[in-house]
Amino acid sequence: MVVQSMLSGTQPGGPERVPANNHFAAHTGPSYSIEQITSEDDLANLREDWNRLSETAESPNVFTTFDWFRAWNQRFTQEAPRRRRLSVLVLKKDGAIVGISPLINRTASRFAVVVRKLEFVGLADYNDFLLGNGPTGQIEAIMDFLVQTQDQWDLVDLRDLPKTGNTLAIVESALSYTGLIYRILPEEDRSPYLLIDAPWSGMVSRLSRSSRHTLRNQQYRLERMRGEGLRVRVIENPQEEPELLEKLIALEGQKRVNGKLVPPFIGRYPEVFQSLFDTLGPRGWIYVALMELGDRPLAWQLGFRCGKRLWDYTKAYDHAFSRFSPGTMLIPAVLDYGFSHGFEEYDFLRGEEPYKMIWNTGYHERFRLAIWSRRWISRARAFVYLDLKTAVYRLFGRSR
């Protein structure tokens, strides 16, 4: 189903009409109309325009691509079909698609209180709206749409929005006249990054003496193994590598944090990552760095190529070779690849683990945008989900 809207007015409770064809209609300014996509068939029809917007974005972001959204949404909907539905907002101007807000409507429960949330699909380090030219007007149109459809949701909870450019200022300005209540919070985890302005040999020379000593010793030990068949590859087309996904999953089964085995990530969602390999791989979004001893994988890193940036998404290594730090020592190979191919930044993504701190030259920050209406039921549910939930999580040492 497509719910179509032309927005008008900025006050909550403004005039709205539901025609017999189940299309919601209202009016908001002459520039933009909005369609709310709620079915898989209508979502599939967006592929071409969605890909166009994501590939021509000023800051390309794999987490805002059509195939990322669809693969994860299909999996999560299978797990909880009654609690999730599409709520993708498509912005049009003069009949052409100029922006997309990739949202889903999810029913969550906290302390026996049911909350209807609009949110991003999840498992992304950077979420965002897909906006073309005129982002100010497009964000204003999105916020107006939220006002006119506030009976469909209790809380808009947008996590991990990148704190770059003037997006935050535009959002606050757009919200200031809607009558909606909102809160902007910094996300706890920052994303360390490293500028790629030299090959690895040049970068390592800038590190502390102890870090240089450690990394060069590790590199020396690995170099000695080249005679035994050690090699490192950066695979640009993972979809063409036979049984690559199976190798990643097998090695991930040994992954440890603080010495303890951790639940698999890729192994939990093999069909999702196979879909991402098949769809995003041919379009140049994915790379896999692989360290092998003969035919035996020792370490891998799955990452993304987003414009001039490399994003380190997830990795694993053979615990039997942990003394060689094979996971960490994939980074020099990826940095050399990045430098030789014209990339300008290596982003470690979410988290400030010690090995990242050796390299990083700065941090990217993200923020959380929570919106609710002045209706008492929305206020009460937002309080339970945001304030009460946060207090309980802090009491028991949890986050997010």
Task: Place the predicted regions along the sequence by residue.
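Intrinsically disordered, low-complexity, positively biased terminal segments
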Residues: 2-20, 130-185, 201-202, 228, ...
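Active-site/acyl-donor-binding loops of N-acyltransferases
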Residues: 2-32, 36-40, 105, 168-206, ...
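Short, flexible turn/loop "capping" segments at secondary-structure junctions
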Residues: 27-29, 119-123, 150-151, 223-227
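A conserved beta-strand-loop-helix scaffold within acyl/acetyltransferase catalytic domains
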Residues: 33-117, 161-191, 195-201, 205-322
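Noncatalytic linker/hinge segments flanking ATPase motor cores
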Residues: 76-77, 128-132, 139-145, 197-204, ...
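A short, structure-level motif marking secondary-structure boundaries and short turns
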Residues: 204, 261-262, 318-321, 336-338, ...
